[in-house]
């Protein structure tokens, strides 16, 4: 538990120290932002800072820092260090600069300002790269929540169409299209902050559940300085790939321009971009701690991972929450 608390403290300290160094390096000033100068009522709309933060957090987080961090805990508490230092020195820096460079270029997408600074060839490469990865990410962000809702419905005693993945996928895709064509402050600006807050509350609930439940123990880094991973999955490079979201995910650059178009002042960038990445790092740290504790309780790293992940991503998250809040219920379900 001490290792977890120290890493949590480092993330918070990193926001106020190194995050400020990054902010001063960029040099935000009092110039008009795109939200003020363009203000088209669709994509360029001034929104409150707290909304910008929560929308940005949900845009970059999602299932990534939950499921990835849980899998990353397979290597033991050493993953805490990767999440902590990756967030402070890489993830936060990347998110901040991608958002602020976009803001200085009229809120342009990453492909567009890449073309401005690196030329047309790199611009086209980035366009193709963005489209392909956005399709992949969009698929995961549709299938994952749909599966989680189906799991909740089934375990809640519901039946019929509500327990089919296709039904929820269609609803999610309909929402995708509506949110895409309607002004950003009408749906995304109203719904996303609520979901972002839920993401934070869920993470807080998880760590409280672990702390108050004597069945769980978060292992210390200094007690596990040996190789904890199973054969065939070395720390380098498997851990760094598995735990990308919550540490160093580069795909956040496609999301940062959305909020760059809605800032009233450049000075909000530190809180919105760097701060949201630190918040994601904290969420990932909590879920990694949950993974370490859960794997030990459910039979060690190898068998624990197999049990938690046996039903897929959605079932893994559901079972983890149930196991933390009510350990005996997991045994009844299985």
Located regions from the model:
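Residue-level detector of conserved catalytic or cofactor/ligand-binding positions
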Residues: 320-334
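Selective recognition of specific alpha-helical transmembrane segments in multi-pass small-molecule
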Residues: 7-17, 130, 134-138, 196-214, ...
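Transmembrane-helix boundary/entry motifs in multi-pass membrane transporters
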Residues: 38-51, 57, 103-134, 325
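Transmembrane alpha-helical segments of multi-pass small-molecule transport proteins
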Residues: 5, 126-133, 153-183, 199-202
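Hydrophobic alpha-helical segments and their helix-loop junctions in multi-pass secondary transporters
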Residues: 138-156, 167-168, 180, 199-226
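Extracellular loop-to-transmembrane helix junctions
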Residues: 2-19, 72-102
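Membrane-interface "cap" regions at the ends of multi-pass membrane proteins
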Residues: 10-66, 262
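Hydrophobic, membrane-embedded alpha-helices of multi-pass small-molecule transporters
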Residues: 48-64, 207-215, 225-290, 325, ...
